[in-house]
């Protein structure tokens, strides 16, 4: 299609418009995260992002170095939440919040809840 394999960017843009394709760079993007089913995520810091519109559908192209982040595990279990809720006489929601604030320390969470 293009002799010598070289593509003139202006010709390419014109050809894309003729085919009903639009593209627009998105500036100011600091971070892009793609959340995966297993709880991990792909994180792109300061990527180049381009929005493309082809036949009334939008596509986003993300370019940059991806870093895979593993899911954060809670430092406590559902059993811990139930125990704290029971011991402190509060709801499981309040117990979970207290455990999050104390980094999973059961005794500290119970004492905080009883002190309120």
Curated annotation (Swiss-Prot):
What SMART domains has UniProt attached to this entry?
A: NAC
Biological process terms from the Gene Ontology for this record are: protein transport
InterPro entries from the xrefs? NAC-like_UBA, NAC_A/B_dom_sf, NAC_arc, Nas_poly-pep-assoc_cplx_dom, UBA-like_sf
What Gene Ontology molecular-function terms does this entry list?
A: RNA binding
Please list the residue ranges annotated as the NAC-A/B domain: 6-75
Q: Which SUPFAM superfamilies match?
A: UBA-like (SSF46934)
Instruction: Give the PROSITE patterns listed for this entry.
Output: NAC_AB
Keywords, ordered alphabetically? Protein transport, RNA-binding, Transport
Please state which protein family the record places this protein in. Belongs to the NAC-alpha family.
Assembly behavior: Homodimer. Interacts with the ribosome. Binds ribosomal RNA.
- Please explain the role this protein plays, according to its UniProt record: Contacts the emerging nascent chain on the ribosome.
| HAMAP family reported in the protein's UniProt record | NAC_arch
The protein's name is Nascent polypeptide-associated complex protein
Species assigned in the record:
Methanopyrus kandleri (strain AV19 / DSM 6324 / JCM 9639 / NBRC 100938)
State which gene encodes it: nac
